Amino acid sequence: MSLDIVILAAGQGTRMRSALPKVLHPVAGNSMLGHVIHSARQLSPVGIHVVIGHGADAVREQLAADDLNFVMQDKQLGTGHAVAQALPALTAETVLILYGDVPLIEVETLQRLLKRVTPEQLGLLTVKLDDPTGYGRIVRDDQHRVCAIVEHKDATDAQKAITEGNTGILAVPASHLQDWLGRLSNNNAQGEYYLTDVIAMAVNDGLVVATEQPHDAMEVQGANDRKQLSELERHYQLREARRLMAAGVTLRDPSRFDVRGEVSVGRDVLIDINVILEGKVIIEDDVVIGPNCVIKDSTLRKGVVVKANSHIDGALLGECSDAGPFARLRPGSVLGAKAHVGNFVELKNANLGEGAKVGHLTYLGDAEVGARTNIGAGTITCNYDGANKHKTTLGADVFIGSNNSLVAPVDILDGATTAAGSTITQNVPAEQLGVARARQRNIEGWKRPVKITKD
């Protein structure tokens, strides 16, 4: 059965008190609308149609993709009117309607809903709530069949007592949708064209309204203000924490842990408090991540240890390598197996061979470092001449003394040593000592300056 998905994302979101369109406000590092689109793609539709209005240019700019069709709703005249704007582009047998400010909806829930759709039956997602204030109420007959949805502002006191609420998410046979939308009226308290009115039309036309419910009511929670947005954020993070713990991760405190991307994990991983995982992160078995670390778009091989307060971005850490505390690995950094990067070390586009050591207070940019090479404290690669970047190459078993400046381009070959305090501007041959510093001179009779005293 072919599927079109319509995502309603035209609302202004005035209660957010923001110039940013409501659907672009982030949850876990991705916009709310971005989460909905991600779920929609997993259903393999023939088309994803995003109805936009307020802040349309910003939405297009942030989320433009070949598989998205943006449809303009110039005037916000209700959800039924919004879906009608997408009608000319719909070609599939079934239409699923989602909302751009409901980011936590699970793909499995939508799959169950879609299974309810036949040419003579539509699927409606409802939710049981302790306090359904603000939700449209699901009205059922004496045989428990859905017969209508009544919006909260139009409901009688008896209808307001109903605890089954409408989520707005429904899947309908496309063959009926155009007719129902054409018959909508705005004769209601809001003066809008309610999509929910198609339920009563379907019943009157002899169709069955089959309902499904999410496993968790937060799946269908929207965000109309910053408080609700924060609630979605926290629920998402706890959900991700539970998923990782089920996969074999120990989290010191699941409430102090954030995922802001796509994370895959091995077994027996230990993650301390205040760790943020961003982008695409791969963590293999037996990895340990200390507190207050950020890991972004990186791969941590088996047995890696990242110590406290380290920032790893776009890096590959080989088996049993370690970094930190207070290490910064920037994009293009690679640590070979058992390589060591210590405190206050920054790497950028640098490749450390197996067993190489950079203990502390060092910057290596655009560098190739051979196996077992040791780099002393205070060393920097001078890789930028003001116009272009240049490479520093260190062979295997090199020893770089403390407080060295390696002025690229420069090669220091296998087994070479550089003396402490050197500024290396020329290649150092294998097994030789490079010394590049002024000779020490001791001045006899020298007197320290004396502070001038004021009268």
UniProtKB/Swiss-Prot annotation:
Residues bound to UDP-N-acetyl-alpha-D-glucosamine: 8-11, 22, 73, 78-79, 99-101, 136, 151, 166, 224, 330, 348, 363, 374
Cofactor: Mg(2+)
Recorded superkingdom: Bacteria
Family: In the N-terminal section; belongs to the N-acetylglucosamine-1-phosphate uridyltransferase family. In the C-terminal section; belongs to the transferase hexapeptide repeat family.
Parts of the chain that traverse the membrane: none
Protein name: Bifunctional protein GlmU
BP-aspect Gene Ontology terms: cell morphogenesis; cell wall organization; lipid A biosynthetic process; peptidoglycan biosynthetic process; regulation of cell shape; UDP-N-acetylglucosamine biosynthetic process
Species this protein is from: Pseudomonas syringae pv. tomato (strain ATCC BAA-871 / DC3000)
